[in-house]
């Protein structure tokens, strides 16, 4: 839901227009200074989109009329994936996803391969009207390169619910750029989400006591 919340905000320029009014610019009340548009038929690219979170984003995006692009090294969704045969969910190479999407959402885990995997080259592949959204882990994006791209207005904007350092350093340009929108890592804080975390924890403890260990790694 956090990803789609960002999509909705960007498509209606809610961040910018609310800020304008709060700053006392009521004279611009009906001025069309920020482009807004419908999200129907827009493309959302999901990096790491074949996983649980990416699939959940697709579950919301598809009924809104969006087309979903997913990057996959194998070039296909895992066998049995719920969208394996959907004509509105396409698996494409990463570069094509970046170049074609109106919204790019990062939904992959942070590891040695994904750390700083989104930087200057990747951002410059995106459309100038596109938005980058990160609700995964901050270090997946090279923030120094992102900041330079946002200063150059390479893309329309980015929404960061996660950052490399949380909160960012007080002197970070992330605070100063009007096309960068920060939220304080709230994607997991919804009441229902936190209740699920509590339920999962108690279920895992109960299973361990009964000798039925779940989610074994090794």
Describe each PLM feature range:
Residues 68-70:
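Short beta-strand "acidic-cap" motif of Rossmann-like dinucleotide-binding folds
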Residues 168-169, 177-196:
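Adenosine-phosphate binding glycine-rich loop
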Residues 52-53:
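Hydrophobic/small residue at the entry helix of a nucleotide-binding pocket
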Residues 1-19, 59-66, 200-210:
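Oxidoreductase and adenylate-handling cofactor-binding alpha/beta cores
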Residues 74-173:
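Rossmann-like adenosine-cofactor binding region
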Residues 46-47:
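Hydrophobic Val/Ile/Leu positions in short beta-strands of Rossmann-like dinucleotide-binding domains
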Residues 36-40, 62, 124-125, 174:
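Short, flexible hinge/linker loops that cap or flank conserved catalytic cores
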Residues 1-43, 217:
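Phosphate-binding beta-alpha-beta segment of Rossmann-like dinucleotide-binding domains, i.e.
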